[in-house]
């Protein structure tokens, strides 16, 4: 457990560093944004953004942390302007070059992403940036914070686990650790069920997550689908999937995750996934081997916890879009909730492969 906490703590510390940074001294200004959004005051939104927009270029001493924090504070204005029917780059003089500079400095898209609005966003009431100021929005941000660092730790562990022999007792031990990390995903979806109204999400929050255009390209708005769970599953079971829709889904969100996870994705693309390697070893050795059975049993538990997240996530998304009387039928990520159903089906299929191997003995 101590190792688990240490691993998660490393990722949480990185989040905290960005969240604590206010390189544009914009905190007090950004906190005025929800009121302007309630009043649909587009000139006020533009004027407020121009008060701190670094139109003369980024300071030479800035690193990743400063650039990410600056994009966070500017980013809330981007979604706000688009919510009121305006392309931000068209109505804010000097905005587009700043966004492109920040994108280069962070190797991320030239707009706010899920990372910017959640784990890189302060949690204190007098500092947390927001589009609306609604309690449901605060709960939405918290639902992501609950699990993001644990998910990042889980990705690192999954990559390490790929090189651990199924015959080693360490394989089952690492799977148990992975299961514990992924349990935080289940906790996050339970939290969302309890505290976020589907009606409020659809009517009040969803309109702020529309795509915008920067530099001649369209960039998706922040959404929970940008969580790098798809990178973990790529390594775990999906790297050789021949499902075209699934591949397109993954590739849609690659630009929105950290460069390190794009590298992990590329490393495993077209190569055997962890499940493939483990099942090949089980076939070669036989599943009557004590450590092989223990490893496969622990691996199946990993899939069980993934399914305990995937199934309610699908139901939650369906609830949110069922309440909408008009408006978009797809999420901010560009996919309908039915895509979550396809992911659930694929996850069940992967789990079935492990169960079949256990049943052979």
From Swiss-Prot:
Swiss-Prot/TrEMBL keywords: Antibiotic biosynthesis, Heme, Iron, Metal-binding, Oxidoreductase
Pathway(s) it belongs to: Antibiotic biosynthesis
Keyword Protein biosynthesis: no
Disruption phenotype: Cells lacking this gene lose the ability to produce pyrrolnitrin.
One Gene Ontology MF term: oxidoreductase activity
TM regions (residue ranges): none
Record EC number: 1.14.19.-
Record's catalysed reaction(s): 7-chloro-L-tryptophan + AH2 + O2 = monodechloroaminopyrrolnitrin + A + CO2 + 2 H2O
Family to which this protein belongs: Belongs to the PrnB family.
Subunit structure: Monomer.
UniProt function note: Involved in the biosynthesis of the antifungal antibiotic pyrrolnitrin. Catalyzes the ring rearrangement and decarboxylation to convert 7-chloro-L-tryptophan (7-CLT) to monodechloroaminopyrrolnitrin (MDA). It can also use 7-chloro-D-tryptophan, but 7-chloro-L-tryptophan is the preferred natural enantiomer.
Name of the featured protein: Monodechloroaminopyrrolnitrin synthase PrnB
Organism: Pseudomonas fluorescens
């Amino acid at each position: 457990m101590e190792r688990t906490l240490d691993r998660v703590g490393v990722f949480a510390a990185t989040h905290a560093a960005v969240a604590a940074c206010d390189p544009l001294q914009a905190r007090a200004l950004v906190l005025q944004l929800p009121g302007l959004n309630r009043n649909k005051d587009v000139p006020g939104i533009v004027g407020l953004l121009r008060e701190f927009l670094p139109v003369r270029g980024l300071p030479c001493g800035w690193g990743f942390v400063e650039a990410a924090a600056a994009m966070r504070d500017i980013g809330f204005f981007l979604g706000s302007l688009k919510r009121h029917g305006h392309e931000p780059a068209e109505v804010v003089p000097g905005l587009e070059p700043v966004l492109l500079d920040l994108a280069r400095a962070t190797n991320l898209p030239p707009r706010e992403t899920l990372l910017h609005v959640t784990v890189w966003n302060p949690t204190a009431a007098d500092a947390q940036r927001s589009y609306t100021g609604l309690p449901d929005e605060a709960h939405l941000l918290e639902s992501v914070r609950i699990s993001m660092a644990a998910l990042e730790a889980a990705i690192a562990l999954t990559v390490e686990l790929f090189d651990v022999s199924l015959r080693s007792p360490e394989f089952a031990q690492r799977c148990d650790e992975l299961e514990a990390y992924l349990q935080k995903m289940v906790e996050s979806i339970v939290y969302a069920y309890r505290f976020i109204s589907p009606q409020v999400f659809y009517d009040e929050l969803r309109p702020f997550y529309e795509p915008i255009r920067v530099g001649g390209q369209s960039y998706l708005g922040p959404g929970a689908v940008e969580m790098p769970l798809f990178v973990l599953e790529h390594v775990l079971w999906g790297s050789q999937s021949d499902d075209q829709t699934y591949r397109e889904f993954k590739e849609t969100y690659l630009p929105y995750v950290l460069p390190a996870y794009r590298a992990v994705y590329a490393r495993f693309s077209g190569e055997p996934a962890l499940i493939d390697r483990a099942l090949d070893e089980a076939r070669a050795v036989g599943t009557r081997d004590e450590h092989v059975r223990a490893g496969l049993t622990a691996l199946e538990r990993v899939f069980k916890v993934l399914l305990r997240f995937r199934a309610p996530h699908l139901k939650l998304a369906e609830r949110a879009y069922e309440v909408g009387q008009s408006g978009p039928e797809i999420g901010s990520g560009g996919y309908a909730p039915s895509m979550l159903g396809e992911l659930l089906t694929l996850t069940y299929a992967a789990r079935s492969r492990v169960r079949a191997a256990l049943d052979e003995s």
